[in-house]
């Protein structure tokens, strides 16, 4: 039966075109003589600083500050062994009973490292009446450190909930009087209130923290120089990778083969940077970028072009996972399906050479699950059905894509993704579920209005409005509260998941951080704001001045 006998009505989204053109297509590598030796010498100096601070207990608070600076400057991957050793020594020495300065920093760094230290240390911040001490209210840096520590809280930590309210209120007051605060610190406070450190992407943080750090009289010249050199070296690698994927994308020719779908290869690579910016994850970034570009085409086909009958055929083709399915598809779907098959076949062959077919099969099942649930959404849209949250969530948490994207990232990390890790991933761990909830809720908050202008499945907002009999504004309030709460669940699972390599857990955290950036105020992936555009340029266009 021909599907073209009658011109179908399509839910066209009118996506804006790419703003980048061929800007990143060509990359000319620039070799700076002697930089590698300079970097190696600087790294030796930093290692010595870490050793000296660790060897003297009186300097352990300074050690924490040094580690924090290394991480925020974007160079911790050079000192992973030293940082791991230092924080392990700190934990073995003090346990939960830290008695030095910078308690908030100690708490944040230990939890970030995976040590589930208690929050009892913050009882020292309160007076005999249970209120936070006035001396803390007058300590701007102390307030900021405590505020940042609260983002590591888990459900039930009341003292950190109180601390969040206290610090947020005091810091907000300070932003209303710019003249009473150091200008650089004033900017730091504004950034923190907008997005605490734990919810910021490390690479973006490096781009923004390096200039701030340079303005501090106390900055370490060795650290600063190393951070700037490394930023530029990594940026060169990233631009080379981006050039590669842009050429791959141009060969697909989206304007010819999928003109109504989103042309977002640069944004896909930016997402890849969010999943891991370090040099050792180059392969992971390239494959992740290609996969996200293909997944975006598939998602748009379901959301913004395909008819219900066409989508049933495409779903069956994905289930069969065979290039022989091309002949069964409508003409416009064939280039998309072929690109999909070619992209995943490339990775399958690579992993097969490493003896990791198990890892590829894990990723493949997540793709199939994603498409099956897109089909459920298409069915709801076709029927005009608004499901309850109980019916809605199991489907839309999957179609939000967080789980799929996490496992896609893992395909490029086969060296640390053990067989036990595969079993963990396919078991639908709570960490995946909570990151999926976060992604879905943030997406729905920012895409709801645009999606409801065409035939589209209902969002979380509509399910909340229907189930709780509330208006849209109140439903948004409920979802923002859920987003805040689900971060606490994510933190708990991050801290309590055992026997899984920490980089795999951090890949989930990086994804959550990226979602916070991507959906900051709008759906920047689809309709980019000026601030988001500047973030991309800060990582991929503008080098650090040395």
UniProtKB/Swiss-Prot annotation:
Protein family membership: Belongs to the terpene synthase family.
Annotated protein name in UniProt: Amorpha-4,11-diene synthase
Protein residues bound to Mg(2+) 3: 443, 447, 451
UniProt EC number: 4.2.3.24
Top-tier EC class: lyase
GO BP field: diterpenoid biosynthetic process; response to gibberellin; response to reactive oxygen species; sesquiterpene metabolic process
SUPFAM superfamilies: Terpenoid cyclases/Protein prenyltransferases, Terpenoid synthases
Xref: InterPro entries: Isoprenoid_synthase_dom_sf, Terpene_cyclase-like_1_C, Terpene_cyclase_plant_C1, Terpene_synth_N, Terpene_synth_N_sf, Terpene_synthase-like, Terpene_synthase_metal-bd, Terpenoid_cyclase/PrenylTrfase
Binding site for Mg(2+) 1: 299, 303
Induction: By exposure to reactive oxygen species. Strongly induced by gibberellic acid (GA(3)) leading to an increased artemisinin yield.
Gene3D superfamilies: Farnesyl Diphosphate Synthase, Terpene synthase, N-terminal domain
A Gene Ontology molecular function term of the record: amorpha-4,11-diene synthase activity
Tissue localization of expression: Expressed both in apical and sub-apical cells of glandular secretory trichomes. Also present in non-glandular trichome cells.
Provenance organism: Artemisia annua
Applied biotechnology: Artemisinin and derivatives (e.g. artesunate), are antimalarial drugs due to their endoperoxidase properties; they also display multiple pharmacological actions against inflammation,viral infections, and cell and tumor proliferation. Artesunate may be a promising treatment for COVID-19 mediated by the severe acute respiratory syndrome coronavirus 2 (2019-nCoV) (SARS-CoV-2) because of its anti-inflammatory activity, NF-kappaB (nuclear factor kappa B)-coronavirus effect and chloroquine-like endocytosis inhibition mechanism.
Catalysed reactions, as listed in the record: (2E,6E)-farnesyl diphosphate = (+)-amorpha-4,11-diene + diphosphate
Pathway: Sesquiterpene biosynthesis
Cofactor binding summary note: Binds 3 Mg(2+) or Mn(2+) ions per subunit.
Binding-site residues, substrate: 299, 303, 440
Subcellular locations according to the entry: Cytoplasm
Role, per record: Involved in the biosynthesis of the antimalarial endoperoxide artemisinin. Catalyzes the formation of both olefinic and oxygenated sesquiterpenes, with amorpha-4,11-diene being the major product.
């Amino acid at each position: 039966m021909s599907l073209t006998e009658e011109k179908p009505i399509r839910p066209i989204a009118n996506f804006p075109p790419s703003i980048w053109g061929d800007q990143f297509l060509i990359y000319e590598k620039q070799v700076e003589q002697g930089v590698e030796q300079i970097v190696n010498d600087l790294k030796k100096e930093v290692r010595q600083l870490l050793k000296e601070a660790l060897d003297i207990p009186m300097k352990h608070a300074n050690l924490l500050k040094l580690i924090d600076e290394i991480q925020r400057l974007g160079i911790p991957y050079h000192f992973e062994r030293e940082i791991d050793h230092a924080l392990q020594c700190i934990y073995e020495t003090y346990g939960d009973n830290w008695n030095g300065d910078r308690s908030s920093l100690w708490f944040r760094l230990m939890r970030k490292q995976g040590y589930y230290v208690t929050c009892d240390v913050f009882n020292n911040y309160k007076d005999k009446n249970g209120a936070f001490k006035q001396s803390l209210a007058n300590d701007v840096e102390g307030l900021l450190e405590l505020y940042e520590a609260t983002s590591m809280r888990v459900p039930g930590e009341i003292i950190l909930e109180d601390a969040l309210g206290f610090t947020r209120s005091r810091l907000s007051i300070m932003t209303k009087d710019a003249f009473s605060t150091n200008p650089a610190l004033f900017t730091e406070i504004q950034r923190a209130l907008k997005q605490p450190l734990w919810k910021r992407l490390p690479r973006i943080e490096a781009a923004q923290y390096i200039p701030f750090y340079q303005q501090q009289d106390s900055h370490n010249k060795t650290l600063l120089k190393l951070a700037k050199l490394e930023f530029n070296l990594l940026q060169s690698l990233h631009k080379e990778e981006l050039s590669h994927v842009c050429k791959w994308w141009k060969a697909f020719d989206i304007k010819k083969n999928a003109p109504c779908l989103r042309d977002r290869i640069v944004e896909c690579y930016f997402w890849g940077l969010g999943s891991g910016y370090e040099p050792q994850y180059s392969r992971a970034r390239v494959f992740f970028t290609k996969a996200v570009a293909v997944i975006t085409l598939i998602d748009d086909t379901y959301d913004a072009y395909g008819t219900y009958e066409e989508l049933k055929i495409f779903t069956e083709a994905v289930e069969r996972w065979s290039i022989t399915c091309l002949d069964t598809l409508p003409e416009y779907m064939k280039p998309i399906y072929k690109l999909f098959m070619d992209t995943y076949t490339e990775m399958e062959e690579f992993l097969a050479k490493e003896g990791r077919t198990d890892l590829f099969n894990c990723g493949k099942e997540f793709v199939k699950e994603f498409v099956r649930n897109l089909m459920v959404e298409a069915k709801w849209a076709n029927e005009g059905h608004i499901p309850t949250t109980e019916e809605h969530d199991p489907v839309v948490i999957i179609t939000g894509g967080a789980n799929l994207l996490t496992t896609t990232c893992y395909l490029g990390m086969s060296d640390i993704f053990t067989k036990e890790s595969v079993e963990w991933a396919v078991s639908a761990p709570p960490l995946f579920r909570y990151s999926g909830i976060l992604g879905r809720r943030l997406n729905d908050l920012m895409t709801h209005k645009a999606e409801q202008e065409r035939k589209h499945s209902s969002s979380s907002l509509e399910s909340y409005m229907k189930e709780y009999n509330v208006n849209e504004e109140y439903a948004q309030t409920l979802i923002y509260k859920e987003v805040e709460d689900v971060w606490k669940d994510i933190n708990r699972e991050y801290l309590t998941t055992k026997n899984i390599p920490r980089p795999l857990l951090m890949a989930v955290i990086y994804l959550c951080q990226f979602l916070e950036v991507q959906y900051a105020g709008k759906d920047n992936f689809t309709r980019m704001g000026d601030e988001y555009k500047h973030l991309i340029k800060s990582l991929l266009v503008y080098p650090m001045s040395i």
